[in-house]
Every structure is written in structure tokens, then in C-alpha cells.
Amino acid sequence: MQPGTDEREWREDCAPRRVLEIFSTKWTSMILHTLHALHDGRARTGVLHRSLPGISKKMLVQTLREMERSGLIHRHVKGTVPPAVEYSLTSLGHRFVGLVDLVYDWGRQNSDALDLLQERPSSRRKSGD
């Protein structure tokens, strides 16, 4: 929201809601972080799939398509046989990685407190890990 904007008015298209919408998908931040931290901002689909344990190929492709529509990554199809598809961070994606890193750093610094939270049914983490 712009300075002076009434924060009681949370329109569907306001910036804070759009940012939280990006974070609300389970894999988006992990894919951004993985592209940036492990692959210097660009990687092929198979490399990303091997770098993200627990994600299905279908979910990876679905998330990559959504990230492309959001302007976070660019999809480049190389003219090889068979065609090779490579994904790279856009300038917006590079800027978003900074925010992802802040959240991940906070998680690392507060892991003890997070461990005390009640486990969510969708969490695969077991107590004692």
C-alpha cells in the first residue's frame, strides 16, 4: 500500500495480498531459492526436480507455469532434439529471492520455537528430526 493509504481497505489486488498469494503456494519460494542458491539463477526442469525432494513432476511443472505467469521466472526452450527447457529468474524473481532469504533466515534462527509448534497434518517432518 502507498503511504497514507487506508490499511483497513485490503483490496484483492493490493500489493501485500499479492505478495502473500505468492508465498501461499508451497513450492514457489523453494523453487526460487533453489534456482538462486544452487543453480546460479537458471536450471532445467530435471535438475530442479532432483534438487527438490518431495515435489512431484506434475506439481513442479504446474508451479513453474504459475511462476512464469507471475513474472518470477522466464521459460526458454532450446532448439535441440529433444527440446531442452530451461528456467531462469527474471529481475522480479531476483528481487523476490531477497524476501525469501529473509523468511528462510528467520526460520533458521527460530527453528527451536518452530519445533515446539503443533505439527500440521500436512507436515512430513517427524518429531526428533
Spans of model-derived segments:
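Generic structural signal for secondary-structure transition and capping sites
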Residues: 28, 40, 69-72, 108, ...
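Amphipathic alpha-helical dimerization/coiled-coil segments
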Residues: 2, 13, 33, 98-129
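Canonical helix-turn-helix DNA-binding module
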Residues: 45-81
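N-terminal helix-turn-helix DNA-binding core of bacterial DNA-binding proteins
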Residues: 10-59
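Basic, amphipathic "hinge/linker" alpha-helix immediately C-terminal to the N-terminal HTH DNA-binding motif
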Residues: 79-103
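Acidic-glycine-rich active-site phosphate/pyrophosphate-binding loop
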Residues: 1-9
